[in-house]
Amino acid sequence: MAKIEMKTPLVEMDGDEMTRILWKMIKDELILPFVDLKTEYYDLGLPNRDATADQVTMDAALANKKYGVSVKCATITPNAQRVEEYKLHEMWKSPNGTIRAVLDGTVFRAPIMIDSIQPVVKNWKKPITIARHAYGDVYKCTEFRIPGAGKAELVFTGADGSQQRATVFDFEGAGVLQGQYNKDDSIRSFARSCFNYALDVKQDLWFGAKDTISKKYDHTFKDIFQETYDAEYKEKFEAAGITYFYSLIDDIVARVIRSEGGFVWACKNYDGDVMSDMVSTAFGSLAMMTSVLVSPDGKYEYEAAHGTVTRHYYKYLKGEKTSTNPMATIFAWSGAFKKRGELDNLPELVHFGEALEAASLQTLNEGIMTKDLCGLAEGITPTAVDSEGFIKAIRERLEAKLA
């Protein structure tokens, strides 16, 4: 069988620990036998980030900007323990944070659903994709303890020296104070990424904030979303047969629980942080969550939503077999192939991405699973296999689909 051709390379970002091992297995078993793979390779493993003073991360992000589609393996964000373990020159920043900043992107997370694992919320029948605005708000706030009585003020000094001030509170005793911010440009970029992604997947977009209480801060989010929709996306949404829906965040949460799923849920930073964990847990497993970073100008970075699976890696180093779930990493590759094929007008590459996903889902639906999923499966008697056995089982089904 002739290998499937590519035109433009994918930007390939290798990673760390057990996911790095899975990365090679997936390439060797599920990609290289079928695709004449073209990638621009960047090693984002922690030793190489340290050796290049993290320049490799910036280079990979800029390559993503140039070529438009990347696929990324999970990476370590070092803490003090990792600095010691890897003898690092310094505590390097999160690669995801660096790439997100370069692309000005929004992260979209969605569950991979299979027949035998039912969501905890029984009426959820379709995936719910969470879009989190990963900038500002409480994550960039300034805060301090108030030692005793006094007046707290909010002061803005303009570039021309003029001032606006407002009293926050007259403290009668000890307390706590916090100031947070966001930027119109960042909110607008977030809105555009959300509208573009909803068009991409042809699903309704929901957004909620608390504009009735926060009449300036949250209201700005509401207004910018509405202005952007009316000016740039209304006609496109109507043509695609999808809708944009805004409501108060508490109403949105209630509607999400009552819904059957099948939409994109745009969230402010804190809401997205909390709700993405709620949604992923209710759907079954973080190992079954896909993640894609989308920039406002249509650049894509696909990855798994989980970490590097350190515990399994230490077992692997001792020569033990591990049953690590590769589904989210496989779906990162398949998502990248589908998007690259779509942009380059290569239907065979799109079909390969679809076939890879279908073969993976078929394997699970037939009861062949990694150990983490066996305890969640209902209505079947699952067979637990190690990572290698699982990937080989997918390959058998993939070969049949491509024959």
PLM features: residue spans?
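N-terminal alpha-helical transmembrane segments of multi-pass membrane transport
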Residues: 2-6, 18, 22-23, 28-53, ...
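N-terminal glycine-rich phosphate/adenylate-binding segment common to multiple enzyme folds
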Residues: 47-159, 163, 270, 274
